[in-house]
From Swiss-Prot:
Protein purpose: Attaches a formyl group to the free amino group of methionyl-tRNA(fMet). The formyl group appears to play a dual role in the initiator identity of N-formylmethionyl-tRNA by promoting its recognition by IF2 and preventing the misappropriation of this tRNA by the elongation apparatus.
UniProt KW Protein biosynthesis keyword: yes
Keywords: Protein biosynthesis, Transferase
A GO cellular component entry from the record: cytosol
Protein name: Methionyl-tRNA formyltransferase
EC number(s) given by UniProt: 2.1.2.9
GO-annotated molecular function: methionyl-tRNA formyltransferase activity
Binding site for (6S)-5,6,7,8-tetrahydrofolate: 116-119
Protein source organism: Nitratidesulfovibrio vulgaris (strain ATCC 29579 / DSM 644 / CCUG 34227 / NCIMB 8303 / VKM B-1760 / Hildenborough)
CDD domains assigned to the protein according to its UniProt record, in alphabetical order: FMT_core_Met-tRNA-FMT_N, Met_tRNA_FMT_C
Organism domain of life: Bacteria
Reaction it catalyzes: L-methionyl-tRNA(fMet) + (6R)-10-formyltetrahydrofolate = N-formyl-L-methionyl-tRNA(fMet) + (6S)-5,6,7,8-tetrahydrofolate + H(+)
Pfam families in UniProt: Formyl_trans_C, Formyl_trans_N
Amino acid sequence: MAESAPLKIVFMGTPDFAAASLRHLLAWDGCDVVGVYTQPDRPCGRGQQCRPSAVKMLALEHGLDVRQPVSFRDEADVQALRDFGADILVVAAYGLILPQSVLDAAPMGAVNVHGSLLPRYRGAAPIQRAVMNGDAVTGITIMQVVKQLDAGPMLLQKALGIGCDETSGQLHDQLAELGGRLLVETLARLRAGTIMPIPQDDALATYAAKLTKADGLVDWNRTAVEVHAQVRGVTPWPAAYFTLRREGQKDVRVTIEPGTIGPLLEQPAVPGTIVGLVDGAIAFACADRTYLVRTIRPADKKPMTGEAFWCGYLSRCEGECPGFAVCEGA
């Protein structure tokens, strides 16, 4: 292909992370997005109304041809993909397993935008797991797609630092933009023939499992640094939560926003115990020191300050909040 010829691209993606990559492609004059694939509209929110994906909304705004197959088991869907005549497929958080027939539908194959420094954190939740594990650095990898999950040869990588108070939601937005920029650079170099794929070292691979609501259950038996990493990693979803036990009253499930690491415990305390109010923040005992929470939300209530929570709820509380006793997914 001549370097000056725009790449004909079929884009495959679904959520906001993917929409950022599509937005960068649409702003680049080196390609022509000839088709877009995204997951079918699905019910979401309290009203369970069907809503289009972020990628679909962006694609329709630009008048692009949007397809939403449930899978590619039907040969007719694979043939419809071939009929676009794309040079290359670009995949970003699509959410469907792509059979070899799909990967072979374009002469240059398929490339993927992945939110980690592969081979670390292959899988569905690389951004959240990096934060939850307390990593200081993560990044974006653009790699070729193969049948094995996130195991294809790497084309380009770029690292990004993780702030000590940064949530997975904040990191997601930064990585989404970085991914879009790195994608365009990768495609430009592929078009020019100036990039060499690098195989991944499978021995260094780790897996980032998809998050569930149970991942938000705060484990106060961990150190305050580890608790802070967990709370940041599950913000905004599924959110950090635990159960507050109040004498003579029903237990109350509460969610918390990321707080700060407090001072060392002055005396031993059972992890999960509320040990005081510090500058308007509720102080929870962890394995080594306190964790200070300034915003807390009881079930079915609006968020409130730590001081308001102290006055409104803890006057009738036993003073112990053993989150580790909560039923998973409750």
